[in-house]
């Protein structure tokens, strides 16, 4: 089966400790790998102010996961994100073109 490139961004509650945030990131990465996806990159983008209140929260912790898979991994991931009380919002996007690999710059 053909693998596609996906990007999932989710927002965690701002009142979580750093340890809880790391546990949540690891939990969703494990869920993806167990479902057969290959995690390419995970970016912990930090705490940011939200444009509007979500569940009475003014700030959220943004996390982005880039991964490849055949598409069957999305439903279990989104179900877990939807049922989690620590996640405020999430969005999964299928990328049309795989982004280029980062090039090392010599100083």
Curated annotation (Swiss-Prot):
Keyword Glycoprotein recorded: no
Keyword Lipid metabolism: no
GO cellular component: cytoplasm; ribonucleoprotein complex; ribosome
Single Gene Ontology BP annotation: translation
CDD domains: bS6_chloro_cyano
GO molecular function, one term: small ribosomal subunit rRNA binding
Domain of life: Bacteria
Alphabetical keyword list: Ribonucleoprotein, Ribosomal protein, RNA-binding, rRNA-binding
Family the entry assigns: Belongs to the bacterial ribosomal protein bS6 family.
Entry function: Binds together with bS18 to 16S ribosomal RNA.
Name of the featured protein: Small ribosomal subunit protein bS6
Taxonomic source organism: Synechococcus elongatus (strain ATCC 33912 / PCC 7942 / FACHB-805)
Gene behind this protein: rpsF
């Amino acid at each position: 089966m053909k693998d596609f490139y996906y990007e999932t961004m989710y927002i965690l509650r701002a009142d979580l400790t750093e340890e809880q945030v790391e546990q949540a990131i690891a939990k969703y990465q494990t869920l993806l790998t167990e479902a057969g996806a290959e995690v390419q990159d995970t970016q912990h983008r930090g705490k940011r102010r939200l444009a509007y209140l979500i569940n009475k929260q003014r700030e959220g912790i943004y996390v982005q996961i880039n991964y490849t898979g055949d598409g069957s991994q999305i439903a279990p991931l989104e179900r877990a994100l939807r049922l989690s009380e620590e996640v405020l919002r999430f969005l999964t996007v299928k990328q049309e073109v795989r982004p280029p690999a980062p090039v090392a710059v010599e100083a």
